[in-house]
Amino acid sequence: MNIYESDKLLAEYLLFHYGSAEEILPYEFGPRKALEYPARCVSENLTASGRALDLGCAVGRSAFELARTCFEVIGIDFSRRFIEAANALKTADLPYLRADEGDRTTPLIARVPAGIERTRVSFEVGDAMNLRADIGVFDVVLMANLIDRLSEPLRCLARLPDLVKPGGQLVITSPYTWLEDFTPRANWLCPALDGLRTALALDFDLVSTRDLPFLIREHARKFQWSVAQATVWIRR
């Protein structure tokens, strides 16, 4: 079974995307600058408007954030469970259970922030390495924490020149956690920034890089603290 179809990962990602600081990290200490990562992927990297694509959208928070300034946003993820949750959040709040300890849980509510025009966003199940031919072109493409979960990263990158309009923005964020569970070793881009530069050099200019910390809570006393590298590219 794909772990991204499991109840455990669905609940973790709903908390990661929509949980409050207190719901995720109820301690006085801890890496608070790592919270709100799906929103920061947009707010700290993009001056976005027009039509946007969120590849690997998970349960949708970044796609909704893009809708603050973009008139149309398409979110695509390979996980059917994630897309079902994102679509449910277009029209209603979504209850879920946060893992605390063992089988002890706390009921929480995932809620899209106020002020977002949710009708601008659509979600669909899809493969980032094999997108439908009629998806069109975009002013903004976001790929957050996706590249190291693809079996053929270069296949996905090769499609990007056809997806981003000239002058459009591409943002790729990733902690580059290469695992053979997802990507055959021969397909790892190591070092990743060099691999991205080589793959995108003919069509994109790299305009900035920055470090973006993020925090995923597994249970009350176990967290994944990671640092993604965000690269911003402009289509020639």
Where are these regions (language model features)?
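A short glycine-rich, Lys/Arg-flanked "PGG" loop and its adjoining helix->strand segment in the class I
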Residues: 154-166
